[in-house]
Each structure stands twice: as C-alpha cells, then as structure tokens.
Amino acid sequence: LNKNGYDTLLGSHPCWKQLIESSNVKFVPIGPDIDIEKEAAVIRGKNKNPMLSMLKTMNFVFDIIVKSTGEVFEACKGMDLIVVSHAQMGATEAEVLGIPTVNVTLQPEMIPEKLKKQTFIKKVIGSFIAGQIAKPYNKIRKKYNLKPAKDIGMIMSSNYDLIPISKYAKERNPYWEPHHVFTGFWYQDEKDYQPEENLDNFLKRGDKPILLALGAMSFEDKAEVNKLDMFVKAFEKTGYRAIVQGFQKS
C-alpha cells in the first residue's frame, strides 16, 4: 500500500512496534503492553485438556479485543478504509464510523459456508456455534448500540475478504460467497537477504525440510520437552527433516 502511494497506519500489540516501524510503516499500539507469549503459555500450562486450554486462551484474547475497542475506535477515525484482520478488530468500529472495510482471513475455517444447504439439525447446531463465536464481538456492538450479530459473517466485510494462501496449498471452499478471494501467499522479495549460516548449511545438507509452526501452542511458560519429543520422534519415524517453531525453553 505504501509503495502505491497510500498513507497507512498499522495498529497492533505494543510488542510489534520496533518490527513495524523498522519497515517504515506508521504504528499505533493497541491493547495492554504485556508479554502475550508468556500469558498464553501460563493459561495453557494450567489446563491439561487441550480443548479447554484453547478455549481459555481464546477467551483471554477476546477479552483484550473487547477492552481495546476505545483505542481501536480512535485509531480508525478519519481513515478512508479499514483492513480488518482475522481477529475482526476494527470491524465494528469501522461500521460505527461509516468507513468501508476489507477483511484479511488467515484461518479459512472461520469463513461461513453461506452457499451450503443445511439440514434442520445442522442449522440448529450451526446457529449455536456461530452465536458463541460472535458473542465477544456482540459485547463490542452493545457498547455502540448496534444490533447483535448472529454470526461472524455479519461482522466481516461484504466487499472483499482476502485470503493470503496459495490455491496450490489449499482448495477454495465451493460454499463460500464470491467475495472471499484466494490471493496467494504475501511474501515481499528481499534481494539482499542472507540466511544465518547455520540455517543455510542445514538447508544445503539434504532434502527440503518441513516447517512445523504451531503458533501459540509452541509458547512455553516452562520447558515442555515431552511435547517437543513427540514431534521430533514423528519426523524421525517418517524420515523427514524439519524446522520447528518455538519451544525456546525446551
């Protein structure tokens, strides 16, 4: 956007300030200045059940989103367009301000299958799940006296939803509405980039490795060697080389 003459402002967690500003992009901090990685790891560490752990982590993130709406609202003022991330921050605030939005979805599973015919039972179950997902966003909508959203689709942009995933990596869901568009991966070419020597040597020593990236699941409050061992043994058994994200304490 900047290269094409647009003046952009990126709002995110305070921990990203240095990285974003080093790329010559204007930045505004949103939310509390806490160690998200550590907090998520602590929450996950208190629950042995992975599903319960995931739900508690999501509630933690949603709570931050709800409490940060005032900061988001101020950051959105005066903008011509709001690009909304998969967390939907900025969507409701843009609606209140009358500013058009474009969505960027990193998790295609969150996109509603509006074109799919549903049985009565599936409609009932789907409506319940959709209502639960929309619940934290309805807390924000209530602050601005907006009608509750029945599902996440009512919050998402009806203009464009850009999905930065390659069509060769994942098939487009035929039940999505037309404005959900696969764009291919967004990687900026860095002509002068040189990988670290250790990484460069590893890549040259054999077949292309698999990259295992687990997002917040790999954040650690304390060493989780057993979990890391599980992945390492799986790669050893299948004979694949791998690069594993996270697990710094293990």
Predicted regions: what is each one?
Residues L1-Y6, L19, A234-T238:
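A short, Lys/Arg-enriched amphipathic alpha-helix followed by its capping loop at the start of a domain
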Residues D7-H13, R241-G246:
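Short internal beta-strands
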Residues L9-M54:
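Conserved nucleotide-sugar phosphate-binding/catalytic loop shared by glycosyltransferases and other
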Residues M51-N59, E113-Y144:
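Alpha-helical membrane-targeting segments
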Residues F62-S127, Y168-A169:
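Conserved nucleotide-sugar donor-interacting segment of glycosyltransferase catalytic cores
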Residues D80-L81, Y160, P209:
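Structural motif
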Residues Q132-H179:
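A short, active-site helix/loop in glycosyltransferases that binds the activated sugar's phosphate group
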Residues E171-S250:
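Donor-nucleotide binding loops and adjacent catalytic segments primarily
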